[in-house]
Swiss-Prot record:
Pfam families in the record: IMPDH (PF00478)
Active site positions, chain numbering: C186
Protein name: GMP reductase
Enzyme class: oxidoreductase
Family to which the UniProt record says this protein belongs: Belongs to the IMPDH/GMPR family. GuaC type 1 subfamily.
Residues annotated as binding K(+): G181, G183
GO CC annotations, alphabetized: cytosol; GMP reductase complex
Binding site for NADP(+): 108-131, 216-239
Length: 347
């Protein structure tokens, strides 16, 4: 046993220090990034925000809606091959280039993902997703996926430390997904005592990944557009959002009515709700590590997408970054004990 003495920080612990800027307008900011990935050799351009691969966020409807904003969607793994075929038949090539195919690590997951990828060559992203990316089995699956799909861009996670980030990249991942426990409906930290404050995890993993020519996704912990800006400022190449995109018409959650008001259910993928829906319940040997919440209906996702992108552009103007690519170089974080004036928050 040992204790690391240096303090680790989350998004709520910092603000971005403003700097002199020559930008005249938020409209001058370029949010689109262009990437060429280490192993696949594929190039991609777009806004590097990703709708999370949760079945109450990462839906086909969400992918179609967010593609118009140049935003990616990691489509959840619970769609059948037939449902994928129907989606592909009704989608343009532009929508498909903004789609990630999500998978677990079982043999059945591998075979199903292979069938989905064979449906259309425009499906270039594979998202290999488990709660704990530290197992040897997971690393072996990433290597197996790289061998099977040498030209596909593979993202893999989740991890929170530099050495594991490096191992996944060396095993074949182009992008590593970073985050254990920061999500709005994740209870891993309180059920297990395991986790890592998200901003510090992003900073550490970005440094490790970029040294090897890899990239990272900051997954979880964002509650406002300002948090998205902080994640990019900390070195994230992509930012994945779950709760911020939940509760919309495209989100796919079940709608319930209570006292005449309608709500949409949103739950973590290790919650009792998710496990009952997909595997029949919580196994005797494990605990649920997610919760279920009822969200007021939020309408179409386009309004939220515009709000996020507008906040990100504004953050860039405050530090003089004419492109999103420059934001991390222009970012200085200051540690704080307050984020906002909350006097009217309950009104």
């Amino acid at each position: 046993m040992r204790i690391e003495e240096d303090l680790k920080l989350g998004f709520k612990d910092v603000l971005i220090r403003p700097k002199r800027s020559t930008l005249k307008s938020r409209s001058d900011v370029e949010l689109e990034r262009q990437f060429t990935f280490k192993h696949s050799g594929q190039s991609w351009s777009g806004v590097p925000i990703i709708a999370a691969n949760m079945d109450t966020v990462g839906t086909f409807s969400m992918a179609s809606a967010l593609a118009s904003f140049d935003i990616l969607t990691a489509v959840h793994k619970h769609y059948s091959v037939e449902e994928w075929q129907a989606f592909i038949n009704n989608s343009s090539a532009d929508v498909l280039k903004h789609v990630m195919v999500s998978t677990g690590t079982s043999d059945a997951d591998f075979e199903k993902t292979k069938q989905i990828l064979d449906l259309n060559p425009a499906l270039n992203f594979v998202c290999i997703d488990v709660a704990n990316g530290y197992s040897e089995h997971f690393v072996q699956f990433v290597a197996k996926a790289r061998e099977a799909w040498p030209t596909k861009t593979i993202c893999a996670g989740n991890v929170v430390t530099g050495e594991m980030c490096e191992e996944l990249i060396l095993s074949g991942a182009d992008i590593v997904k970073v985050g254990i426990g920061p999500g709005s409906v994740c209870t891993t930290r309180v059920k297990t005592g395991v986790g890592y404050p998200q901003l510090s995890a992003v900073i550490e993993c970005a440094d490790a990944a970029h040294g090897l020519g890899g990239m990272i996704i900051s997954d979880g912990g964002c509650t406002t557009p300002g948090d998205v800006a902080k994640a990019f400022g900390g070195g994230a190449d992509f930012v994945m959002l779950g709760g911020m995109l939940a509760g919309h018409e495209e989100s796919g959650g079940r709608i319930v009515e209570e006292n005449g008001e309608k709500f949409m259910l949103f739950y973590g993928m290790s919650s009792e709700s998710a496990m009952k829906r997909h595997v029949g319940g919580v196994a005797e040997y494990r605990a649920a590590e997610g919760k279920t919440v009822k969200l007021p209906l939020r309408g179409p996702v386009e309004n939220t997408a515009r709000d996020i992108l507008g906040g990100l552009r504004s953050a860039c103007t405050y530090v003089g970054a004419s492109r999103l690519k420059e934001l991390t170089k222009r970012t200085t974080f200051i540690r704080v004990q307050e984020q906002e004036n909350r006097i009217f928050n309950n009104l």
